[in-house]
Amino acid sequence: MILIIDDDSAIRSSLSFMLKRAKYDVQAVPGPKEAIEIVRSVAPQLILMDMNFTLSTSGEEGLTLLKQVKVFRPDVPVILMTAWGSIQLAVQGMQAGA
C-alpha cells in the first residue's frame, strides 16, 4: 500500500488516481493524525508526504511527522513533497530519514 499524506484534496485525488491506474493499493489522508493511525497499524510500502498541513510554509510540520513515522516504521521509504522547498529543508528531510 502507498500512503499519501496531503492536506490538499486535489493533490490526494490526482496522486491516488494515477497510482490506482497503475494497479497500486493506495490510501490517502489529509494530515498527521490520520497518517500516524495508519502507520501504527500497517507498514506502507511507500509514503508520499506533504511538508505543510497549515498556512505555515516552514516545513516543520512535515519534518515532525516524518520523525514520528520513522519511530514506528524506520524502514518505510518516504518521499517528501512541497511547493515551498529549499535546499535547507531538503537536507533536513534527508537527515530525518526521507
Language-model segments: residues:
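The short loop immediately C-terminal to the conserved phospho-acceptor aspartate in CheY-like receiver
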Residues: 8, 52-57, 77
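Short amphipathic alpha-helix used as the core "switch/output" element in two-component signaling
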Residues: 37, 58-74, 92
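Conserved sequence signature across two-component system core domains
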Residues: 5-6, 29, 47
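Two-component/phosphorelay signaling modules centered on CheY-like receiver
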Residues: 9-27, 33
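Active-site beta3 strand of CheY-like receiver
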Residues: 42-48, 52-53
